[in-house]
Regions:
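Conserved GNAT-fold acetyl-CoA-binding loop/helix
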Residues: 3-26
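A short helix-loop-beta-strand connector motif used in the catalytic cores of GNAT acetyltransferases and
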Residues: 26-38
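Conserved beta-strand in the GNAT
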Residues: 36-38, 44-53
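Glycine-rich acyl-CoA binding loop
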Residues: 39, 77-82
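Conserved donor-binding loop and adjoining core beta-sheet/short helix segment
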Residues: 49-63, 67
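A short, internal acetyl-CoA/4′-phosphopantetheine-binding micro-motif in the GNAT/acyltransferase core
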Residues: 66-76
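Conserved beta-strand-loop-alpha-helix junction that forms the acyl-donor binding cleft
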Residues: 76, 88, 93, 98-109, ...
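Conserved active-site alpha-helix within GNAT-family acetyltransferase domains
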Residues: 82, 86, 103-121
Length: 127
């Protein structure tokens, strides 16, 4: 599923098997930074989510990044994305939730806005 997600238009990088393996190993190692979740419907795996924990000096509180949120095509629009975000809110009720979304991903943007997210007015950079 990670390969499907990173090959989709929802992500601007393609990832690699090496990165996917490192991500999964980090999740199952009991990492303080990364958590992985399997999303199921009717006892079938239909998606996954990954959360990264940090602290936001900008907002003065713990921060949880929704790094990945992927649902198979046939399960989009069924409320599972909203349920996952509500679950994360319940796990981290006092944390700032952040995520990235491609500007063209209108359906995801609608879900995130309904869940209370809004846009920040700056660009993200990496090194």
């Amino acid at each position: 599923m990670m390969q499907e997600f990173y090959a989709s238009d929802a992500v601007s990088t393609n990832g690699s098997l090496e990165i996917f393996e490192a991500d999964i190993n980090e999740c199952i190692s009991g990492s303080a930074y990364l958590e992985g979740y399997v999303i199921e419907r009717d006892d079938t795996t239909v998606g996954y989510g990954m959360l990264a924990r940090s602290y936001s000096t900008e907002f003065g509180k713990p921060c949880v990044w929704i790094e990945d949120l992927y649902l198979k095509d046939e399960c989009r629009g069924c409320g599972l994305g909203t349920q996952f975000i509500e679950y994360v809110n319940g796990l981290y009720p006092n944390a700032l939730l952040r995520l990235e979304v491609e500007a063209e991903n209108d359906s995801a943007i609608r879900v995130y806005k309904r869940c209370g997210f809004d846009f920040l007015p700056y660009l993200e950079m990496k090194k």
